[in-house]
A protein has these predicted regions:
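Catalytic cores of nucleic-acid endonucleases
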Residues: 399-441
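Accessory nucleic acid-recognition modules appended to NTPase machines
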Residues: 2-3, 237-391
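N-terminal pre-Walker A segment at the start of P-loop NTPase domains
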Residues: 1-44
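Conserved lysine of the Walker
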Residues: 61-62
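Interdomain motor-coupling "hinge/lid" segment immediately C-terminal to the ATP-binding subdomain
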Residues: 2-6, 157-272, 276
Length: 441
């Protein structure tokens, strides 16, 4: 492969200031709203490291890589030590091999023994892992830091599991849409700086931090309503709206991913419609199959698994509170990982948006599931979300003007249940506003 092809993707080799003219960096700088993803600090930069970055489409993985490259250059890393290549035009592992051979020859000519190697969309070339494994085993990467991004095939085909004992100091990093707390940082950094974060899910800690944030409640509530409308995907945040172009672009990516794994677009849409129409109730795989004309419950299970691995949904299983284990046979709750998917699938599936209260409960469940093993519980009454932290804790979501006293309710090993409200706060009754809780989470 010609070195010139590599040079086009690494303009900083000529002049490190050229990183400022990179298309992704330029778009980032020109954005009305911009931020540096927190994941930039999670990537291991100690040789040898093989890092994998996962996440949904259009969540900003490429921008993250470019911002890290910019940071390394600003810190004085020799420009030729930084190698970036976008792999979506490569056919197979042999072409990836040619790319790496060309870079190895180049760095040898510069007497470089340690590099930062960024391979974006590395899962596009077929059997890409063969080349990476080969150069790890031959020792060519022994002094390098590798950062690889890819699609859901890394999960579905379990390709990451093909590197046992070959990761070094590397990490798996999941990059998700902005949480509500991160959303506040983008839109009101001056408030974000004053808002504390809870260290653990414990009553005294939660209410101490909640009361510290309470003076900013009006602005927090205003931003929460905005978050419900646009979610945390970068394009929606930058535009401050979910445009039709953004929805069409994301749906095109989903269809492309489905085609690669030989899954039906029509069945996918039926299940997405079922999720929207059944929320926030727990669903039966059998009933979804019958009601939405899908062959078997196994098909529904398989597509939900695909959706979860595409970082579109999170599945919450019923928890048995005596044994503290999930019951996989009972109905399961499905939540979208970001409000954006409500608007996308409502449009694509030609179905109405659910009530705002449903969207709010979904946001709570998705936020808690990012940090904790999350479930739900139902018997005579239902607890919307149950988390397994240092202890078993329940959360009931009430997007209304009234709320019950949850301080005295104990169910099995769940000794604490908090009621997340629209705007009520009462430590004695375990009541705390939803927006305030998500702000300090």
């Amino acid at each position: 492969m010609e070195l010139e092809i590599l040079s086009k993707q690494n303009p900083w080799w000529k002049d490190k200031a050229e990183i400022e003219n990179d298309e992704d960096i330029r778009k980032w700088k020109d954005g009305k709203r911009k931020w540096v993803p927190s994941e930039i600090n999670e990537i291991s930069l100690k040789p040898f490291s093989l890092n994998f970055i996962f996440g949904p489409r259009q969540v900003g993985k490429t921008t993250l890589l470019k911002l890290l490259i910019k940071k390394l250059l600003e810190e004085g890393v020799e420009k030729e030590r930084i190698f970036y290549f976008r792999c979506d035009k490569l056919t197979d592992f042999k072409e990836l091999d040619e790319v790496l051979k060309t870079y190895f020859e180049f760095r040898k000519s510069k007497n470089i023994s340690s590099s930062f190697i960024f391979l974006d969309e590395v899962t596009f070339p077929k059997e890409w892992f063969r080349t990476i494994k080969f150069y790890i085993d031959t020792g060519d990467f022994k002094n390098d830091v590798l950062v690889l991004t890819g699609s859901l095939s890394m999960y579905l085909k379990k390709e990451v599991e093909l590197f046992p004992g070959r990761r070094g100091f590397g990490k798996d990093i999941i990059m998700m849409p902005l949480t509500f707390r991160e959303f506040i940082k983008v839109f009101s950094p001056e408030i974000y700086e004053k808002i504390p974060k809870i260290e653990r899910i414990e009553k005294e800690e939660i209410f101490k931090k909640a009361y510290e944030a309470l003076p900013y409640f009006d602005r927090i509530q205003e931003l929460f309503k905005k978050y419900l409308k646009i979610g945390g995907f970068p394009l929606a945040v930058k535009n401050e709206e979910i445009t039709q172009d953004v929805k069409e672009s994301y749906w095109a990516w989903i269809k492309s991913d489905l085609a690669k794994i030989d899954r039906s677009e029509e069945i996918f849409k039926r299940i997405a419609k079922a999720i929207l129409e059944k929320m926030p109730s727990a669903i039966s795989l059998n009933s979804i199959a019958k009601e939405f004309d899908i062959s078997t419950h196994k098909t529904v299970f398989e597509y939900l698994d695909v959706m979860e691995k595409m970082f579109i949904v999170k599945i919450l299983y019923h928890i048995e509170l005596d044994k503290i284990i999930p019951n996989l046979k009972k109905n399961r709750k499905i939540c979208f990982v970001d409000p954006f998917f409500f608007y996308l699938f409502s449009d694509i599936c030609l179905t109405n948006l659910p009530d705002e209260s449903v969207l709010v409960e979904n946001v709570v469940a998705s936020h808690l599931s990012r940090k904790f093993d999350s479930f739900y519980w139902k018997n005579q009454r239902e607890i919307d979300v149950v988390i397994r932290s240092e202890e078993i804790i329940g959360f009931e979501v009430k997007w209304s003007e009234k709320a019950d006293d949850f301080s005295k309710i104990k169910i099995g090993k769940m000794r604490n249940i908090f009621c997340l409200t629209k705007d009520l706060i009462d430590k004695e009754k375990n009541l705390i506003p939803i927006s305030l809780f998500l702000t300090i989470l």
